[in-house]
From Swiss-Prot:
Any one GO cellular component localisation term in the record: nucleoplasm
InterPro entries linked to this entry: HD, Homeobox_CS, Homeodomain-like_sf, SIX1_SD
Keywords: Activator, Developmental protein, DNA-binding, Homeobox, Nucleus, Transcription, Transcription regulation
Gene field: Six5
Skewed-composition ranges (Basic and acidic residues): 272-282
GO biological process: cell population proliferation; lens development in camera-type eye; Leydig cell proliferation; negative regulation of cell population proliferation; negative regulation of DNA-templated transcription; negative regulation of skeletal muscle satellite cell proliferation; positive regulation of transcription by RNA polymerase II; spermatid development
UniProt keyword Acetylation present: no
Residue segments, region Disordered: 1-73, 241-287
GO molecular function, one term: RNA polymerase II cis-regulatory region sequence-specific DNA binding
DNA-binding region: 194-253
Name this protein carries in UniProt: Homeobox protein SIX5
Family per record: Belongs to the SIX/Sine oculis homeobox family.
Length: 719
């Protein structure tokens, strides 16, 4: 019986074992070999007996002929290839390199040479343990191995190269030395698929990830799992690759040269089954970046817009007035020069954005006083006054008359609705010629002020500027004047407040000096037109002790027009008069454009407002029937925080008489001076101190429109 030879050189694992463990392993190996030899001997003996019996029966011999001797049983180990492969695979998986070496040493040379894949891998491991690297390289290059064992054999090959170089150099290798060895001695094709590894992702894995990314940038968790199984990557690596690729595409680096790193290496538990917020904000940002429509006045809060809506706009308390930018303000082609702008130290002021453009499209109001919602429109281009109807497609009518008991809808944005009509007053018949556009000088460069007014407080305040303000009053008015609503492209945005908000407007064309806007924001339209090309508008803006001082000097031919479509639930009361005579050339207001020409304007159904909702003022600017005023007796004091100095406000004659002169509607014809003095608790003084002086001024002869140079002062002057 043959015994297994002693192990020439024990591996590191065998040297680390105790002597008792070594003896036990040798004893187990002897028992295994004895068992295999006994089984092989029995099989050989049975085969030899059968052969001898066949020889005896097949070749009878004579009596004197000698018998052939029986073939001896071979003394060497004879195992089947399957048995040898099974034992080698079991020892390889168990990691017993010493026992594997002893088993291979006990096999005949013929068995070792014709060994299968497990035998060759076992021989390669034994050669590595013994330090026989040449035999290891020969074994690995002898035949191709399955891809499942490439990682194990590649590790053996590289470790053998490293140990061989360390033995030759006499020192340990660094990372650079190992990298150079890998480049100098590439892996054999028998244990390598030939694909270059880019960090931890192979070419095939990257191709699969890119193909999936082109079809779906946000794969579901199930798709990620299937992709991880297909590429041999983990779910974390797949998720990181998709996240990094999307980030590179957003920053613009994904479409250029291919990036070597496909993952940042940071593990993540994020599932990423839904779209990221950055991608969802793309559509919203593109929509928000669109500039708002022109011909709008934005009365916003303290926050300024993110972008300038148009090149012809001005943002007070903002950065749109920079010297390096294009002209900040262009009113119909004429530049506006901003002088003494000192708003940098007060950053809490709300922005005032003024833009100019075309008129908006009217919308029908929700709460109308009458079915036909009409508006008086003064066309700044043609100089004609027309009556627009929200439901009609023909926006212009020139000869419009009313009948008895009908209501007159007009056009203003967000005006307090009046009560139902209760009384009437007649209008004398007369022709209605088209009148030219008036040429007036505005008192202030701004058309409105953002305000917040509670239902119980009589004060008008500017948000985030001053906490107190004064009263905006409406007279004992009759008959609601329904107004059209503006289109969505031309909004009048007012800062939200707890109660109704007030905006002070200067509207000389229709004789309105005060408006009340409810808290609900409704769109409107204001146009500031300058017919004189190349004529600049000089304005001065300054902030002193929480107050805004606005000074303006406009050319005498400056045209201030107002195109106001109707708004829902808005009405402007009219002063009740026993009879208003409309002289020839005056401006009548009709209820509908469908009435025939030549008829007279009948009485207008009106009803006084409740006394509780009217705050009387000590001084106002009434328009008598002789002056053909449509709207009268409005007092509009300025707020305390926004003050116009008496010396800084241009002085111009008051008493806007509606006559048939060549000057058009709103010709100014008295010596009475219209001033905006220092605010007082009694109200704003317009013109003279009493209504009698104003009436006397209206009867005086017409004078030429005058204009004074604006001189800003440090402190307001008392009258």
């Amino acid at each position: 019986m043959a015994t297994s030879p002693a192990e020439p050189s024990a591996g590191p694992a065998a040297r680390g074992e105790a002597a008792a463990a070594t003896e036990e392993q040798e004893e187990e190996a002897r028992q295994l070999l004895q068992t295999l030899q006994a089984a092989e001997g029995e099989a050989a003996a049975a085969g030899a007996g059968d052969a001898a019996a066949a020889a005896d029966s097949g070749s009878p011999s004579g009596p004197g002929s000698p018998r052939e001797t029986v073939t001896e049983v071979p003394t060497g180990l004879r195992f089947s290839p399957e048995q040898v492969a099974c034992v080698c695979e079991a020892l390889l998986q168990a990691g017993h390199a010493g026992r594997l070496s002893r088993f291979l040493g006990a096999l005949p040379p013929a068995e070792r040479l014709r060994g299968s894949d497990p035998v060759l891998r076992a021989r390669a491991l034994v050669a590595f343990q013994r330090g026989e690297y040449a035999e290891l390289y020969q074994l690995l290059e002898s035949r191709p191995f399955p891809a499942a064992h490439h990682a194990f054999l590649q590790d053996l090959y590289l470790r053998a190269r490293y140990h061989e170089a360390e033995r030759a150099r006499g020192r340990a290798l660094g990372a650079v030395d190992k990298y150079r060895l890998r480049k100098k001695f590439p892996l054999p094709k028998t244990i390598w698929d030939g694909e270059e590894t880019v960090y931890c992702f192979k070419e095939r894995s990257r191709a699969a990830l890119k193909a999936c990314y082109r079809g779906n940038r946000y794969p579901t968790p199930d798709e990620k799992r299937r992709l991880a199984t297909l590429t041999g990557l983990s779910l974390t690596q797949v998720s990181n690759w998709f996240k990094n690729r999307r980030q590179r595409d957003r920053t613009g680096t994904g479409g250029g040269a291919p990036c070597k790193s496909e993952s940042d290496g940071n593990p993540t538990t994020e599932d990423e089954s839904s779209r990221s917020p950055e991608d969802l904000e793309r559509g919203v940002a593109s929509m928000a970046a669109e500039a708002p429509a022109q011909s709008s006045i934005f009365l916003a809060g303290a926050t300024s817009p993110a972008t300038c809506p148009a090149s012809s706009s001005i943002l007070v308390n903002g950065s749109f007035l920079a010297a390096s930018s294009p002209p900040a303000v262009l009113l119909n082609g004429s530049p506006v020069i901003i002088n003494s702008l000192a708003l940098g130290e007060n950053s809490s002021l709300g922005p005032l954005l003024l833009t100019g453009g075309s008129a908006p499209q009217p919308q029908p109001s929700l709460q109308g006083v009458s079915e036909a919602k009409n508006s008086l429109v003064l066309d700044p281009q043609t100089g004609e006054v027309r009556l627009d109807e929200a439901q009609s497609e023909a926006p212009e009518t020139k000869g419009v008359h009313g009948t008895t008991g009908e209501e007159i809808p007009g056009a203003l944005p967000q005006v307090v609705p009046g009560p139902p009509p209760a009384s009437t007053f007649p209008l004398t018949p007369g022709a209605v010629p088209a009148v030219a556009a008036p040429q007036v000088v505005p008192l202030s460069p701004s058309s409105g002020y953002p305000t917040g007014l509670s239902p119980t407080s009589p004060r008008l305040n500017l948000p985030q500027v001053v906490p107190t303000s004064q009263v905006v009053t409406l007279p004992q008015a009759v008959g609601p004047l329904q107004l059209l609503a503006a289109g969505p492209g031309s909004p009048v945005k007012v800062a939200a407040a707890a109660g109704p908000t007030n905006v002070h407007l200067i509207n000389s064309s229709v004789g309105v000096t005060a408006l009340q806007l409810p808290s609900s924001t409704a769109p409107g339209n204001f146009l500031l037109a300058n017919p004189v090309s190349g004529s600049p508008i000089v304005t001065g803006v300054a902030v002193q002790q929480g107050k805004i001082i606005l000074t303006a000097t406009f050319p005498t031919s400056m045209l201030v027009s107002q195109v106001l479509p109707p708004a829902p639930s808005l009405a402007l009361p009219l002063k009740q008069e026993p009879a208003i005579t409309v002289p020839e050339g005056a401006l009548p207001v009709g209820p509908s454009p469908t009435l025939p020409e030549g008829h007279t304007l009948g009485p207008i159904s009106t009803q006084p407002l409740p006394p509780a909702s009217v705050v009387t003022s000590g001084t106002s600017l009434p328009f008598s029937p002789d002056s053909s005023g449509l709207l009268s007796s409005f007092s509009a004091p300025l707020p305390e925080g926004l003050m116009l100095s008496p010396a800084a406000v241009p002085v111009w004659p008051a008493g806007l008489e509606l006559s048939t002169g060549v000057e058009g509607l709103g010709t100014q014809a008295t010596h009475t001076v219209l001033r905006l003095p220092d605010p007082d608790p009694q109200g704003l003084l317009l013109g003279a101190t009493t209504g009698t002086e104003v009436d006397e001024g209206l009867e005086a002869e017409a004078k030429v429109l005058t204009q004074l140079q604006s001189v800003p002062v440090e402190e307001p002057l008392e009258l």
